[in-house]
């Protein structure tokens, strides 16, 4: 993990069904705030609110905030700009930076994950890490405030 935390607590979480009242058992929005066992904090949000005008199926942004800068990953597109995704922006004490990662990295993680499943190895991620991520998601869902 980026933070090196090995465990975390869910501090707050919410779920809602904003756009699909005909399916009351489902949620189309969820978020959670976590604090790691090393003091690092995290927030994630998932939703099904992609506007019809967006040229891809979802937004796919990741923000990593640190004490000396931050990184923003734009996986699928840079809104209002031509071209594809795989944009990396970062700001540090030296200035503002940009890297076009399209076609430069490939997808090594997914290949390693498939091989882990086939070979029962732990190269992409450990089983302990995968189970901890799943546990935290379930805990966030179970304790989530249902927004009406």
Q: Can you say where each PLM-predicted feature lies in the sequence?
A:
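Glycine-centered tight beta-turn/hairpin loop motif at sheet-sheet or coil-to-beta transitions
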Residues: 37-41, 68, 93-94
